[in-house]
């Protein structure tokens, strides 16, 4: 994300330069360096030693290569930026301005997502502390890396295992404790029922 704005500025400058050169070519003039009257003999020798046709052909090839590279970059940018359907033809400047607005929009969304993630992390930590306070001290808890995989190691008898309830987070509860945790879980679901777009 940090390199995109700098690349965009380069493309904007290149597009303005190309349009300025095209306008100059249409009017039949170009920017020429002023002649230095102090050294006429040196400039005359440079003109005689260099072939104007070769210089012009090299310049044309370099300009052609640069325009082709710029065109490829603009085509790639057009695929990444959502364009308006009102106008089928988009100029280079309008495309670059839309790309700049799109980058700003993505940066704002990233900031809001980070803020939401931090709020959820703090809320999750508070809920874990509350859950730890509600659970009795002799309750066995399983540490799991994910909700899909959990292991249970206990030396309880088979009759004791039948009276226990295991929730999705690997917390072993007895009958009365299970009812308490069900009501608490309902409160957790209610706290997370806020739509995601409210934060975004």
Curated annotation (Swiss-Prot):
It holds the Pfam family HLH. The keyword Metal-binding does not apply. SMART domains: HLH (SM00353). Residues 26-56, 134-164 are annotated as: Disordered. Residues 54-106 form the bHLH domain. It is found in: Nucleus. InterPro entries: bHLH_dom, HLH_DNA-bd_sf. It comes from the Eukaryota. CDD domains: bHLHzip_Mad3 (cd18932). One of its GO terms (molecular function) is protein dimerization activity. Transmembrane segments: none annotated. Keywords: DNA-binding, Nucleus, Repressor, Transcription, Transcription regulation. One of its GO terms (cellular component) is nucleus. Efficient DNA binding requires dimerization with another bHLH protein. Binds DNA as a heterodimer with MAX. Transcriptional repressor. Binds with MAX to form a sequence-specific DNA-binding protein complex which recognizes the core sequence 5'-CAC[GA]TG-3'. This is Max dimerization protein 3. The gene is mxd3.
